[in-house]
């Protein structure tokens, strides 16, 4: 094989000879001049200073001395301290729990709801037995305001949501983080507010600085001509089952009537469940409520056995109808009809025997009839059949 010819334009790689040629090209004056001996002595520590520095920790006053002893040493950059983890967001706690007790006041303030069934297509329904509203997310929930006399001018209606259970009452009810980021804002309501008012431009959304609770306020408007009540349309903007929000905890909506100064004129409340199928959930909870409402008989003190239920009904119990033991003779014309009635009688006797409503003698007689397809007699009763031909008349 022929060796490849080297290109004369390519220089050979560096070697010991080329390095010596490059070294001769350097200037005669040394670039790296040694430090003066005095400067080297200044950088060195005496044995006493070294022993003291090893035995004692340098205080804040000794830091300048160390920097003066080594003016040419660059300060070592301190390692960056790791950032502390951000604290987990906690639920805002309220300093007070608003009252949920019904107060009609001097104006007879009370609430009303539209009558609706439990169909699957319903979006909002109210259960009078449970005093609970079932509604879908962001659907219209009409609430009627009834008063006996007109409140003073400037009165307002406030709606606030609180948790029903005592262990959660101090927490502020707000939307879950997912629904807070949704682009469903109407330009008036803050994204964290659960309750909104639909179709009212005079609505105000309040964040109490002391209790941190959210509420929505609208001016009270008297009923229109021909109407007996005022209707406000509310929206609930988060499901009851949302993680990070209500998290399946029941809530109450408190509706208060206030004057222009914020003084209470009336109060009422109802429970709310925001779900996907309000009709189904209402029907289920009402059935469970009726089952729990059935009277349960308590055990007497000191007794470990179940007490027998006491019959408190005054109506007399219907007596069982005694079995008819009388026998009859039936005259049948024609063999075909006779066989049909005989089979019918045997079937009825067998049914009574299986139901346990027939005495032992009848059961024995029915079994005997089943085995013998003709006229039969028993010790206790006797069936008589008379066969008549066509010319018996």
Swiss-Prot record:
Residues 273-280 are annotated as: Interaction with DNA. Residues 100-370 are annotated as: Interaction with HIPK1. There is a cross-link at residue 386 (Glycyl lysine isopeptide (Lys-Gly) (interchain with G-Cter in SUMO)). The modification Phosphoserine is found at residues 9, 15, 20, 33, 37, 46, 183, 269, 315, 392. Residues 1-44 are annotated as: Transcription activation (acidic). Residues 283-297 have a biased composition (Basic and acidic residues). A motif (Bipartite nuclear localization signal) lies at residues 305-321. The modification Symmetric dimethylarginine is found at residues 335, 337. Residues 77-90 have a biased composition (Pro residues). Forms homodimers and homotetramers. Binds DNA as a homotetramer. Interacts with AXIN1. Probably part of a complex consisting of TP53, HIPK2 and AXIN1. Interacts with histone acetyltransferases EP300 and methyltransferases HRMT1L2 and CARM1, and recruits them to promoters. Interacts (via C-terminus) with TAF1; when TAF1 is part of the TFIID complex. Interacts with ING4; this interaction may be indirect. Found in a complex with CABLES1 and TP73. Interacts with HIPK1, HIPK2, and TP53INP1. Interacts with WWOX. Interacts with USP7 and SYVN1. Interacts with HSP90AB1. This is Cellular tumor antigen p53. It comes from Chlorocebus aethiops. The gene is TP53.
């Amino acid at each position: 094989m022929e060796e490849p010819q080297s290109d004369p334009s390519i220089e050979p790689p560096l070697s010991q000879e080329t390095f010596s040629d490059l070294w001769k090209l350097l200037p005669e004056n040394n670039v790296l001049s040694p430090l003066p001996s005095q400067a080297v002595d200044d950088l060195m520590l005496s044995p006493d200073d070294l022993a003291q520095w090893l035995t004692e920790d340098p205080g804040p006053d000794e830091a300048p001395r160390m920097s003066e002893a080594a003016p040419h040493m660059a300060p070592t950059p301190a390692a960056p301290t790791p950032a502390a983890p951000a604290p987990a967001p906690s639920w805002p706690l309220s300093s007070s729990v608003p009252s949920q007790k019904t107060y009609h006041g001097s104006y007879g303030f009370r609430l009303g709801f539209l009558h609706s069934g439990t169909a699957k297509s319903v979006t909002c329904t109210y259960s009078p037995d449970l005093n609970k509203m079932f509604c879908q997310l962001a659907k219209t929930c009409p609430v009627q305001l009834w008063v006996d006399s007109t409140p003073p001018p400037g009165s307002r209606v406030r709606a606030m949501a609180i948790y029903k259970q005592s262990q959660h009452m101090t927490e502020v009810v707000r939307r879950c983080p997912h629904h807070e980021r949704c682009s469903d804002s109407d330009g008036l309501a803050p994204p964290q507010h659960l309750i909104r008012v639909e179709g009212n431009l005079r609505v105000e959304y309040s964040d109490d600085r002391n209790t941190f609770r959210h509420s929505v306020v609208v001016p009270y408007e008297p009923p229109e001509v021909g109407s007996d009540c005022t209707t406000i349309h509310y929206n609930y903007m988060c499901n009851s089952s949302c993680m990070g929000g209500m998290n399946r905890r029941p809530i109450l909506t408190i509706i208060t009537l206030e004057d222009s100064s914020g003084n209470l004129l009336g109060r009422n409340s109802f429970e709310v469940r925001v779900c996907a199928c309000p009709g189904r959930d209402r029907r289920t909870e009402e059935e469970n409520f009726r089952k729990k409402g059935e009277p349960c008989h308590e055990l007497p003190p000191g007794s470990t056995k179940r007490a027998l239920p006491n019959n408190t009904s005054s109506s007399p119990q219907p007596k069982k109808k005694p079995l008819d033991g009388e026998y009859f003779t039936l005259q049948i014309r024609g063999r075909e009809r006779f066989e049909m009635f005989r089979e019918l009688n045997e079937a009825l006797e067998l049914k009574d025997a299986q139901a346990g409503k027939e005495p032992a003698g009848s059961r024995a007689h029915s079994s005997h009839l089943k085995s013998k397809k003709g006229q039969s007699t028993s010790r206790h009763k006797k069936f008589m059949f008379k066969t008549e031909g066509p010319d018996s008349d």
